[in-house]
């Protein structure tokens, strides 16, 4: 009888990535297979997120439900990982006696070892340290699950925004070596992956070591990934405006594999609130980035994050945010009502914005962005869009689902053979959260792949130095 593993994941795409690596790790080294049913599992893992309000209590409520399973099966192993584990490891140990393992985002690679410690009789094995990049060195080879894949290129954040727990739960910025990332993506491409999403808490701060002792910038990494055979689309998340340098913008100008969609969190349009948040930039600097981006890639769509009701936010501050939303014409947003995160500088500020006022501002903001998104979607009516077919439609399994470059889901009637490939569809209807398409042509009619000589690729970024020696600059 095979051993079963159940993982419950809360939070960001980085957590989703980490959970997939936990499953791969325990599957390869200890033979565990995933199950959707906690009642069937031999190991229960909770991968937590500390961004939202009452994150700690949410963890204890879940552990209370799992405790009933452990009461029935004393051999059941329960582990808690992620950012809440990193921040509240001792509290979890003290309050939840049913928990056997507590591990942080940077120590998930030690799971097999920690499980063995529990089996040898040790209680509450805890490791929430920050051993830099060691985590990636000890994970199994990547395994593709469809035509898209997430690849973590760096961890942590060193910006210390006043409201954010990430530097305290995931540590400061640490970048993976560029060769390791390129190898992982090449392996995924061999398995049929066509689109990669590069992950990091502050992904454009990437500074990875190269094989010759140099440093690879994020802009250089994007071009290296674009050169990998089989990779036709590149996305990345999440970025910080102060790291969005001109060399990254230049990649949008000459690298078609980089999609015409960017998620660039701004949090507020008020300079006063941005200063209180310790964001390190003003609203006009953010707009300057967008202006230069749209010069390089005129059709790019922009999404962002907003925090509503930050301590001291006045009606005038909120009006500044709404003005920024209008000026930038955001296409999508992740918007949240502010709630203090324990241990952050902002937690010491008086939460002086009335909750009803916060809710009203949030509704106004979301309504405006929904209107702008629908306007963009209506402009797509009658156009032909190239989409990567990800699988069956969620609402109708007899149809297919794909995604446009600007991150819109399109449902259409198509054949199973199109899954994992690009197709062209005509947009025939528009909905709030998706588009309706009509199949036009498949990948075999697109002439997507062209045979290129090495000299053609090198010529793309060829430069001559002062001595007339030709060099390749990625």
UniProtKB/Swiss-Prot annotation:
<dbReference type="GO" id="GO:0035597">
    <property type="term" value="F:N6-isopentenyladenosine methylthiotransferase activity"/>
</dbReference>
<dbReference type="InterPro" id="IPR013848">
    <property type="entry name" value="Methylthiotransferase_N"/>
</dbReference>
<keyword id="KW-0004">4Fe-4S</keyword>
<feature type="binding site">
    <location>
        <position position="164"/>
    </location>
    <ligand>
        <name>[4Fe-4S] cluster 2</name>
    </ligand>
</feature>
<feature type="domain" description="TRAM">
    <location>
        <begin position="378"/>
        <end position="441"/>
    </location>
</feature>
<dbReference type="InterPro" id="IPR007197">
    <property type="entry name" value="rSAM"/>
</dbReference>
<feature type="binding site">
    <location>
        <position position="83"/>
    </location>
    <ligand>
        <name>[4Fe-4S] cluster 1</name>
    </ligand>
</feature>
<feature type="domain" description="MTTase N-terminal">
    <location>
        <begin position="3"/>
        <end position="120"/>
    </location>
</feature>
<comment type="subunit">
    <text>Monomer.</text>
</comment>
<comment type="similarity">
    <text>Belongs to the methylthiotransferase family. MiaB subfamily.</text>
</comment>
<dbReference type="GO" id="GO:0051539">
    <property type="term" value="F:4 iron, 4 sulfur cluster binding"/>
</dbReference>
<dbReference type="GO" id="GO:0005829">
    <property type="term" value="C:cytosol"/>
</dbReference>
<dbReference type="InterPro" id="IPR023404">
    <property type="entry name" value="rSAM_horseshoe"/>
</dbReference>
<dbReference type="GO" id="GO:0035600">
    <property type="term" value="P:tRNA methylthiolation"/>
</dbReference>
<protein>
    <recommendedName>
        <fullName>tRNA-2-methylthio-N(6)-dimethylallyladenosine synthase</fullName>
        <ecNumber>2.8.4.3</ecNumber>
    </recommendedName>
</protein>
<dbReference type="Pfam" id="PF04055">
    <property type="entry name" value="Radical_SAM"/>
</dbReference>
<dbReference type="Pfam" id="PF01938">
    <property type="entry name" value="TRAM"/>
</dbReference>
<comment type="function">
    <text>Catalyzes the methylthiolation of N6-(dimethylallyl)adenosine (i(6)A), leading to the formation of 2-methylthio-N6-(dimethylallyl)adenosine (ms(2)i(6)A) at position 37 in tRNAs that read codons beginning with uridine.</text>
</comment>
<keyword id="KW-0949">S-adenosyl-L-methionine</keyword>
<feature type="domain" description="Radical SAM core">
    <location>
        <begin position="143"/>
        <end position="375"/>
    </location>
</feature>
<feature type="binding site">
    <location>
        <position position="157"/>
    </location>
    <ligand>
        <name>[4Fe-4S] cluster 2</name>
    </ligand>
</feature>
<keyword id="KW-0819">tRNA processing</keyword>
<dbReference type="InterPro" id="IPR005839">
    <property type="entry name" value="Methylthiotransferase"/>
</dbReference>
<dbReference type="InterPro" id="IPR006463">
    <property type="entry name" value="MiaB_methiolase"/>
</dbReference>
<keyword id="KW-0963">Cytoplasm</keyword>
<feature type="binding site">
    <location>
        <position position="161"/>
    </location>
    <ligand>
        <name>[4Fe-4S] cluster 2</name>
    </ligand>
</feature>
<dbReference type="InterPro" id="IPR006638">
    <property type="entry name" value="Elp3/MiaA/NifB-like_rSAM"/>
</dbReference>
<keyword id="KW-0479">Metal-binding</keyword>
<dbReference type="InterPro" id="IPR020612">
    <property type="entry name" value="Methylthiotransferase_CS"/>
</dbReference>
<keyword id="KW-0411">Iron-sulfur</keyword>
<feature type="binding site">
    <location>
        <position position="49"/>
    </location>
    <ligand>
        <name>[4Fe-4S] cluster 1</name>
    </ligand>
</feature>
<dbReference type="Pfam" id="PF00919">
    <property type="entry name" value="UPF0004"/>
</dbReference>
<feature type="binding site">
    <location>
        <position position="12"/>
    </location>
    <ligand>
        <name>[4Fe-4S] cluster 1</name>
    </ligand>
</feature>
<keyword id="KW-0808">Transferase</keyword>
<dbReference type="InterPro" id="IPR038135">
    <property type="entry name" value="Methylthiotransferase_N_sf"/>
</dbReference>
<dbReference type="GO" id="GO:0046872">
    <property type="term" value="F:metal ion binding"/>
</dbReference>
<keyword id="KW-0408">Iron</keyword>
<dbReference type="InterPro" id="IPR002792">
    <property type="entry name" value="TRAM_dom"/>
</dbReference>
């Amino acid at each position: 009888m095979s051993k079963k593993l159940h993982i419950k994941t809360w939070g960001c795409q980085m957590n989703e990535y980490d959970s997939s690596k936990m499953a791969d790790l325990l599957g390869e080294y200890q033979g565990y297979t995933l199950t959707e049913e906690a009642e069937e599992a031999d190991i229960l893992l909770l991968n937590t997120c500390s961004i939202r309000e009452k994150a700690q209590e949410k963890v204890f409520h879940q552990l209370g439900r799992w405790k009933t399973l452990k009461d029935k099966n004393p051999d059941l192993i329960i582990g808690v990982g992620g950012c809440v584990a990193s921040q509240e490891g001792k509290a979890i140990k003290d309050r939840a006696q049913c928990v056997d393992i507590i591990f942080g985002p940077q120590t998930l690679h030690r799971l097999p070892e920690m499980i063995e410690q529990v089996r040898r009789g040790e209680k509450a094995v805890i490791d929430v340290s920050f051993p830099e990049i060691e985590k990636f060195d000890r994970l199994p080879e990547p395994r593709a699950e469809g035509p898209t894949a997430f690849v973590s290129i760096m961890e942590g954040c060193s910006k210390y925004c006043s409201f954010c727990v990430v530097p305290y739960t995931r540590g400061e910025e640490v970048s993976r070596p560029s060769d390791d990332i390129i190898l992982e993506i090449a392996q995924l491409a061999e398995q049929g992956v066509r689109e990669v999403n590069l992950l990091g808490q502050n992904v454009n701060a990437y500074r990875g070591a190269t094989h010759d002792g140099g440093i690879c910038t994020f802009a250089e990494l994007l071009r290296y990934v674009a050169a990998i055979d089989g990779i036709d689309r590149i996305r990345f998340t999440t970025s910080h405006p102060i790291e969005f340098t001109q060399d990254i913008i230049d990649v949008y100008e000459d690298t078609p594999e980089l999609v015409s969609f960017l998620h660039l969190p701004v949090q507020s349009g008020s300079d006063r609130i941005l200063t209180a948040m310790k964001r390190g930039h003003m609203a006009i600097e953010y707009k300057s980035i967008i202006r230069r981006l749209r010069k390089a890639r005129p059709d790019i769509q922009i999404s962002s994050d907003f925090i509503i009701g930050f301590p001291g936010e006045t009606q005038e501050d909120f009006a500044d945010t709404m003005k920024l939303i209008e000026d930038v014409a955001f296409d999508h947003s992740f918007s949240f009502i502010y709630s203090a995160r324990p241990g952050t500088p902002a937690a010491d500020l008086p939460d002086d914005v009335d909750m009803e006022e916060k809710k009203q501002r949030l509704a106004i903001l979301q309504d405006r962005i929904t209107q702008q998104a629908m306007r963009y979607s209506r402009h797509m009516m009658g156009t032909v869009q190239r989409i990567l077919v990800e699988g069956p439609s969620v609402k109708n399994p007899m149809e297919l689902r794909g995604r446009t470059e600007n991150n819109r889901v399109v449902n259409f009637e198509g054949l199973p053979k199109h899954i994992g490939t690009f197709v062209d569809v005509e947009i025939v209807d528009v909905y709030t959260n998706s588009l309706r398409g009509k199949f036009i042509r498949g990948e075999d009619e697109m002439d997507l792949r062209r045979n290129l000589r090495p000299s053609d690729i090198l010529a793309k970024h060829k430069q001559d130095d002062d001595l007339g020696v030709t060099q390749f600059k990625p």
